[in-house]
Amino acid sequence: MAMALALRRLSSSADKPLQRLFNGGHLYSMSSLPSEAVYEKERPGVTWPKQLNAPLEVVDPEIADIIELEKARQWKGLELIPSENFTSLSVMQAVGSVMTNKYSEGYPGARYYGGNEYIDMAETLCQKRALEAFRLDPAKWGVNVQPLSGSPANFHVYTALLKAHDRIMALDLPHGGHLSHGYQTDTKKISAVSIFFETMPYRLNESTGYIDYDQLEKSATLFRPKLIVAGASAYARLYDYARIRKVCDKQKAIMLADMAHISGLVAAGVIPSPFDYADVVTTTTHKSLRGPRGAMIFFRKGLKEVNKQGKEVFYDYEDKINQAVFPGLQGGPHNHTITGLAVALKQATTAEYKAYQEQVMSNSAKFAETLVKSGYELVSGGTENHLVLVNLKNKGIDGSKVEKVLEAVHIAANKNTVPGDVSAMVPGGIRMGTPALTSRGFVEEDFAKVAYFFDLAVKLAVKIKGEAKGTKLKDFVTAMESSAIQSEISKLRHDVEEYAKQFPTIGFEKETMKYKN
């Protein structure tokens, strides 16, 4: 009861002044580390405070060195994995702050630990900013910012709103869906979602690469799902949310929109929003949103309808979802992540952020156009969001082999299934996206160059395949080790690195890097 009362107080507490939290300074600063004066009262034999306040390079040079290597990789490479991004320095400062020290099971105003005054302020501010970022009325929408990542967030929703073995429909994984929506093969339930719930996929029309909404509606009529997921991890087109809403209404099913990949684009208003149609919306917070690694669950609240008897019916999602997150499936929230998310959500309402997301879209369109002109087949023929899915079958090579060559030349992309694949172990495609490199300042002409590098890598992969003594990936990797091939890889890697190094790093300064060569 106390938890429910506290949750109802969130909207009013969100309006309280927050000056005490910031106190005119920074949430986190290396210069705020204690000086030697702090240790004037140290007790005999109590030596650990000095160690606890020593910098990373002193305490653990091995980990410090690994971090420096990762900085160099990010600086010298081309990051094309669409689920990745470079989060801001300010977000990383918040995530690396003292907010990591506090346990706070429960919700603002209803914690199971004391000392959470400022944790409550940060979480309440994060919730307020989440609603503002997506232009939502707090009387009609609520949000939980405690989920640790996207897959748990989806499972929280299923646990809250469904009974065991209720039915879920979602986009098939080989057609661009996600494991957290439930996936099983003919012989095995791969995702835990498919163990605890009954799942049925809808698919793309393989001739067009678009979702087959007609077949989805027919399947839903037969399957009678309790929940339908509108969301994907490798679908380059916009969802027809209105069409899925219509199917949900017909089946009296809950509509869950998983906007994990596209939430940054939605926040900036450069693509249609699912909030006009969905009952519940989930998202991760790192991908196009460019925050820390976490997740959010948005849910409708307030008046749902007036029934035939003239009685008002209200949404009952809020308490169910909050209780599924805690205490149902999680304990203490990650307060440092929530604090960093609050910073990212503030950034998401700026003019710079909107301009960034517009550039993400322009870059994706240019990338797709250049790839098509270079003879590549794209699933659905193009893109309407931040990613492209390349079908490599007309090149006579699979995604696993191309991914190996791309990685060797410092281009990060991922192999991906495409319609018509018979094995997830030998996927026919490569998935690539524009958010990360756009964060570094890449524009259209740069993505034309990236497409050129990709084309060279694919041609090299085809050559290596021709020289391999077998058809398996291990045979391909062995063929990559020849001196002639290594020479070609080295040249392409050099060209990629020299191009990438021209652009700004995000979250750290080039001048402070240990490995610059």
Curated annotation (Swiss-Prot):
GO terms for molecular function: glycine hydroxymethyltransferase activity; pyridoxal phosphate binding. Its cofactor is pyridoxal 5'-phosphate. Its EC number is 2.1.2.1. Pathway: One-carbon metabolism; tetrahydrofolate interconversion. Pfam families: SHMT. Residues 1-31 form a transit peptide. GO terms for biological process: glycine biosynthetic process from serine; tetrahydrofolate interconversion. SUPFAM superfamilies: PLP-dependent transferases (SSF53383). It is found in: Mitochondrion. PROSITE patterns: SHMT. It comes from the Eukaryota. It catalyses: (6R)-5,10-methylene-5,6,7,8-tetrahydrofolate + glycine + H2O = (6S)-5,6,7,8-tetrahydrofolate + L-serine. Homotetramer. HAMAP family: SHMT. It is an enzyme of class 2 (transferase). Signal peptide: none annotated. Its main location: mitochondrion. This is Serine hydroxymethyltransferase 1, mitochondrial. The modification N6-(pyridoxal phosphate)lysine is found at residue 287. GO terms for cellular component: mitochondrion. Belongs to the SHMT family. Catalyzes the interconversion of serine and glycine. Keywords: Mitochondrion, One-carbon metabolism, Pyridoxal phosphate, Transferase, Transit peptide. InterPro entries: PyrdxlP-dep_Trfase, PyrdxlP-dep_Trfase_major, PyrdxlP-dep_Trfase_small, Ser_HO-MeTrfase, Ser_HO-MeTrfase-like, Ser_HO-MeTrfase_PLP_BS, SHMT-like_dom.
